[in-house]
């Protein structure tokens, strides 16, 4: 009798819970189905309509954004509703909010690696950590980081010298990624990195494997569920990579602690390049030093966010420069004005601040090819987006990849015109949200200034040394509006966009170089 009673109680609880879940889903559906969007299939929702391959997804997102006139529309993946936004007025509503700071569903695949680091944390924790790390991106700290950028950039140029001798076609995307990985690893940890020279450390290998796992889970029906993911080989790959990463970072942290102690006693008053790790080792949160786990999470976040997005931006900028020789010529002339006779000099902050036209080129490139094509927030309470009611616990996805193709804000969007961003009044009101490659509002990228300086520094070195050429002479501009279903690439060398956490080209960034 006792067992029967227990069974009845458990069954009652399960039924009660089931009814509550059903009513909750029904309530959400009642709100969200009032919003325009593609018709979902049973269970999987709109999963198949958006494509299951990295190269399909960006095209589908762009096409749906145009289909709904770049206004917000809803989609459904399994039982999770998404609100897809691409209009700056709607995006301003979200990014300006001081309460919509939570990143949940779409960032869950990063959490085994980045934990509660600055990218993935939310609420009070994020706010405290953001203030704590602000000194790491002050002008004096950036000057130290740029020494690493200049030295590694010099090694990068030496590698490219060999390719320029024969003017052979090569994939810039791959080499740029190695360069930025070397830079970010050294600036994060203080340890020399040699990815450009073909050396692969445990840290490099672990980072690559973890990026592979995140990319795989993003587009896999099976692996996106934790329980099923644990049954796959990718779970073991993730475990091995995390073990290697933590072991290597623990070693580096221990070594750096000893170095800091030695510097404090033996090198007082001497200027040194301080890596990001130093900020973490000396920081105090609520009067306490950071735990080892917190330090590892923040170093991992610094490496992840400072590697892939920067590499993507530089790679696509090289592509746009290769297809627009007149614009490239103007950028090269700007470099000559800044450096004068010392054309091989170091691009310090004073010189980088003068590279106005180069910055316009980078911003115009990011309009078309944003490194982070989608950013997301989760609303924990019901919200109103410019008159549209959105149910709580919806994942609000801002489609940065589509914003630059909206004729309402950018006339002739497939024309590469850096001067679009020259308007000095263009950083107020809605104008500030027309293009947000570094996000905006309270959760704007804390390292935006350093990211821009790094991109300008590396591109400056390349522009002063090489003429950047298309894969084949005479190629058209190669900017394709994939939001239109009838879009056909202008050549086989045009990038085939895919989303592998950051925006990449499936067929690489194919260019040639010629010494100036």
Curated annotation (Swiss-Prot):
<comment type="similarity">
    <text>Belongs to the cytochrome P450 family.</text>
</comment>
<keyword id="KW-0560">Oxidoreductase</keyword>
<dbReference type="InterPro" id="IPR001128">
    <property type="entry name" value="Cyt_P450"/>
</dbReference>
<dbReference type="InterPro" id="IPR050196">
    <property type="entry name" value="Cytochrome_P450_Monoox"/>
</dbReference>
<keyword id="KW-0256">Endoplasmic reticulum</keyword>
<dbReference type="GO" id="GO:0004497">
    <property type="term" value="F:monooxygenase activity"/>
</dbReference>
<dbReference type="GO" id="GO:0020037">
    <property type="term" value="F:heme binding"/>
</dbReference>
<keyword id="KW-0492">Microsome</keyword>
<dbReference type="GO" id="GO:0016705">
    <property type="term" value="F:oxidoreductase activity, acting on paired donors, with incorporation or reduction of molecular oxygen"/>
</dbReference>
<keyword id="KW-0472">Membrane</keyword>
<keyword id="KW-0503">Monooxygenase</keyword>
<keyword id="KW-0479">Metal-binding</keyword>
<dbReference type="GO" id="GO:0005506">
    <property type="term" value="F:iron ion binding"/>
</dbReference>
<dbReference type="InterPro" id="IPR017972">
    <property type="entry name" value="Cyt_P450_CS"/>
</dbReference>
<dbReference type="GO" id="GO:0005789">
    <property type="term" value="C:endoplasmic reticulum membrane"/>
</dbReference>
<dbReference type="InterPro" id="IPR002401">
    <property type="entry name" value="Cyt_P450_E_grp-I"/>
</dbReference>
<protein>
    <recommendedName>
        <fullName>Probable cytochrome P450 4ad1</fullName>
        <ecNumber>1.14.-.-</ecNumber>
    </recommendedName>
</protein>
<dbReference type="InterPro" id="IPR036396">
    <property type="entry name" value="Cyt_P450_sf"/>
</dbReference>
<keyword id="KW-0349">Heme</keyword>
<comment type="function">
    <text>May be involved in the metabolism of insect hormones and in the breakdown of synthetic insecticides.</text>
</comment>
<dbReference type="Pfam" id="PF00067">
    <property type="entry name" value="p450"/>
</dbReference>
<keyword id="KW-0408">Iron</keyword>
<feature type="binding site" description="axial binding residue">
    <location>
        <position position="445"/>
    </location>
    <ligand>
        <name>heme</name>
    </ligand>
</feature>
